[in-house]
Regions:
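Glycine-rich, flexible N-terminal cofactor/catalytic loop recognition
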Residues: 2-68
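A contiguous loop/helix-start segment that scaffolds small-molecule binding in enzyme catalytic cores
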Residues: 12, 87, 166-235
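Short active-site oxyanion
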Residues: 36-42, 114-118, 165-167
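Short beta-strand scaffold positions
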Residues: 44-45, 101, 170
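Short, acidic/turn-prone active-site loops that include or flank metal/cofactor-
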Residues: 47-48, 65-72, 123, 144-149, ...
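Short hydrophobic/aromatic-enriched beta-strand-loop microsegments
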Residues: 60-68, 117-118, 138-144, 189-195
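Glycine/small-residue-rich loop that forms an oxyanion/phosphate-binding "nest" at active or ligand-binding sites
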Residues: 67-70, 75-124
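Class I SAM-dependent methyltransferase SAM-binding "motif I" and its flanking Rossmann-like core
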Residues: 105-163
Length: 235
């Protein structure tokens, strides 16, 4: 029996938030592939990158750019498409739309307009890193990317010192040294786990205090975005 034959068809006028692989293409879900095949249009953070993903799975769909600097205008267009009964799939470069990526604005607009929104879950750097970190997963606080300005970053880190549970950040390879330096000043005693290249050939976890990790990174040049996890304060 074809498993798709037992599944309900996509609903017209629905915004589908489709999670895409964070590195390993085998992590895409069967449901994600079905939605991408059956939708009317794919709104993508980077149409070139998403186009490559669609071609890999032999899917041909119109692509609509949706990113940080055009999301206000594009959100209005997507809402109009939904009102006409179109089925719109929203994807980002990797992971779930709206999680440290564009998506929140159009979701809020769709809900405010009384339109249907469905999540199509899948790969998540946050979950992948946290579950393999060895740190407490009973309670955690997802921060995402800190502000770029040093004063704002420091203020937020000072506030987070009192937050219970594991802290989870995203950071680029260009600012990882800066973040570790700030953590060394604000949370010097905490254990930290750096996760990089998740689901890829060179997936790696680095563990230690901020000071220890700074010393380690001096001898290495690391690429790819990091998930930075900070252990809770010792009881």
């Amino acid at each position: 029996m074809d498993p798709d034959s037992t599944l309900p068809p996509l609903v017209p006028g629905t915004l589908y938030l489709v999670a895409t692989p964070i590195g390993n293409l085998e992590d895409i879900t069967l449901r994600a592939l079905r939605v991408l095949r059956e939708c009317d249009v794919v709104a993508a953070e980077d149409t070139r990158r998403s186009g490559q993903l669609l071609r890999y799975f032999d899917i041909s769909k119109p692509l609509l750019s949706y990113f940080q600097f055009n999301e206000a205008r594009r959100s209005e267009e997507i809402i109009e498409r939904l009102r006409r009964g179109e089925k719109v799939a929203l994807v980002t470069d990797a992971g779930s739309p709206g999680i440290s990526d564009p998506g929140e604005r159009v979701v809020k607009a769709a809900i405010a307009a009384g339109l249907r929104v469905e999540s199509v879950p899948g790969a998540s750097a946050l979950v992948a890193a946290l579950t393999a970190s060895g740190l407490s997963t009973e309670e955690f606080h997802f921060v995402g990317f800190l502000p770029h300005k040093s004063g704002q970053r420091r203020k937020q880190l000072e506030t987070l010192r009192a937050v219970p549970g594991t802290l989870v950040f995203y950071e680029s390879p260009y600012r990882i040294d800066k973040l570790l330096g700030e953590l060394n000043e604000v949370l010097p005693e905490r254990q930290i786990v750096l996760a990089r290249e998740l689901t890829k050939k060179f997936e790696e976890y680095l563990r230690g205090t901020a000071s220890e990790l700074l010393t380690l990174l001096k001898s290495r040049t690391l690429k790819g975005e990091f998930v930075v996890m900070v252990a809770p304060a010792a009881a």
